[in-house]
């Protein structure tokens, strides 16, 4: 029993040491990448998209948590849910929880359209610069770096959007089956 405990502690210490070396290596390599102009453009594109997609990331994330709570029959505060729809109280006071969830999801569409519109504009500018229509030798690499930085955040937004729409479809199916 004692040898088991000692071996477990040795493995935990070894794992912590490996994690430390991995994270310091990632940190150093990240610093080296940012020293290049393309890496800096990637970082700026990543941070800019993160700021712009903040409402979508937290909105879809909160929606997914609330929808999963509804599907597992956990208690959901109707007043808090009505606040998240950004609708007047008079309009939401007689609505069911699935209807409030649908309103909440529909309220995120404006931000989604704006975000995907800006991302598409970044894609067009990047492609124009890479096809040498804007001068690929001067600014093409910077636009490409910013685009790929924004693409990382867009992947998360897209994944959360798909998950939220899937959960809303499951809620609609459950409500229609239960009548």
Curated annotation (Swiss-Prot):
As for membrane topology, the entry says: Multi-pass membrane protein
Record keywords: ATP-binding included? no
Q: Which UniProt keywords apply?
A: Cell membrane, Membrane, Transmembrane, Transmembrane helix
| GO-annotated cellular components | plasma membrane
Regions that span the bilayer: 9-31, 41-63, 114-136, 146-168
**UniProt-annotated location(s):** Cell membrane
Name of this protein: Uncharacterized protein aq_757
Q: Which organism is it from?
A: Aquifex aeolicus (strain VF5)
């Amino acid at each position: 029993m004692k040898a088991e405990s000692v071996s477990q502690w040795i493995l935990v210490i070894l794992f912590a040491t490996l994690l430390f070396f991995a994270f310091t290596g990632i940190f150093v390599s990240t610093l080296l990448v940012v020293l290049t102009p393309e890496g800096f453009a990637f970082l700026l594109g990543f941070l800019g998209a993160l700021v712009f997609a903040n409402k979508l990331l937290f909105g879809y994330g909160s929606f997914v948590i609330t929808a999963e709570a509804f599907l597992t029959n956990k208690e959901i505060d109707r007043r808090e849910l009505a606040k998240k729809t950004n609708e007047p109280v008079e309009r939401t006071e007689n609505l069911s929880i699935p209807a409030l969830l649908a309103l909440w999801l529909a309220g995120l569409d404006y931000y989604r359209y704006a975000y995907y519109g800006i991302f598409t504009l970044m894609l067009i500018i990047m492609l124009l610069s890479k096809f040498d229509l804007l001068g690929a030798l001067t600014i093409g690499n910077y636009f490409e770096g910013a685009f790929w930085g924004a693409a990382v955040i867009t992947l998360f937004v897209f994944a959360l959007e798909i998950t939220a729409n899937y959960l809303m479809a499951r809620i609609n199916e459950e409500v229609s089956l239960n009548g």
